């Protein structure tokens, strides 16, 4: 039992720790039983492959023989990849929040052999620093508590577990109203940094689910403050150092309020959602810089993030032990590479002889992104890209996550329509086919994570929701009935596997193995939309497309299960709120004809779902008994069984969806 067991995993993050002197175990009953047999606590460490501070703590503590000896003697040590097991991460991050800590990664928790958390934190340094104890001091303190104050520790763990269980309990059912949307929208609007863009102070995250909701609120209210909040974020992202101006793609967050310096890891989910936001904003008011950033980010996805036909999870922040080394520049490097072009490039991108960040330069535009300037410097950027390609590359976490790929597929479909980019649609179709073939277990259920064809974790609600949403996006773009059929089948399966008696949904399936003690119901969004919010959108879109009563009922019950939450909680669930708005005022736009279909797919209203009609594929008429237009090409907007009169040209179609 003394060996490090992480080589048994497929996770790139866990494999990074496979040579640690720590006797790491994989998450599961076996580790808890070992702790029970040895009568010691569990030390649970949760991180992810692209996490800079996870690497720092690993180097400082987990690679240290003396620290590892203490860990091995006094604890059963368990490593978890948060991307592979978001259910475990959610449970124990919630426990840390309940203890009054802000949270973050690496997440370090101490558990009873039953898995109850009684103490925790995030990163601890190897020596006392900045008012923090050293990691060894923490280990000694926890061991002392376990030996001398165990009853108190177990009581604390039981109380925290009970609190987490109460959060997962069913709430009084209710119904959302436009007043709830108003309250949440204005609460979020008050958080906007109107000068720098985005929300709050440093560190700054894109918070894409919030801005997607603010965009839908602009569609509902036509209040320009909501539109300007979205534009303010996107303008800042397009110009700032958080965007990789040489290679494309956006970093996870900025360490400053101005978006100047990123934390350099690149996550698939961020780039998917930002690409989709760029498409929505460009559809509302075309801006060439949005199209340029979307196309370059797509190029980065195809060049650097492919895992077969699907997409990999993340790129690391560190190269050769140094954060951001791959991405930053010295001024003389740029002089040598660009020659006569160097002066204009350095002036545009704030390149200084002394550096603009820790002696080196993060490329960022000094002025708002200008498409003319951007295009004029494309040759210079290409030269730097060729030079940068000779450097040691950041590590790629090449596991395939179903939910994140679902976000990416839907974003690419949206981008294909708005930016007239059929290559995005082809990539989306290929990725979807890869998920449908490769992300299933022996029983045919979707799984959450695979790597090299090996299953890493069972499927969660977020996977079913993201996959179904991706299928619906592809149906809107192609009209192929198999996508609609797949979405319906996955939505029905999710209601069975994840369903609660009140119409709500659990994160984990009813047959989940080795899950946390509490089966969570997660309706608030984080960096990604909640599975509940996404599945609510799926139910609503299926209702609009098919007019089947089961989908309206499913949507109403799912939204209603959380409608009784406190207003502050609802403001943290923008995806669920957007689904309610879609149910209340959305509809199905039936279109036939290439020009009308293209216009429909490029429109800005997220509450309108497109039904591309090919009469040869629907010989028995439209779902729900709706009549097909008598004349082709034509379009009509249906809400339930009520449809508009047909329109026959693009201008009339746009007037119809904007009415």
Label every model-predicted segment.
Residues 217-221, 281-289, 415-422, 474-481, ...:
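Inter-helical turn/loop segments and adjacent helix faces that build the functional surface
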Residues 303-306, 437-464, 472-620:
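Long, polar/charge-rich, low-hydrophobicity segments
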Residues 1-411, 415-418, 452, 559-659:
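Replace the tail clause
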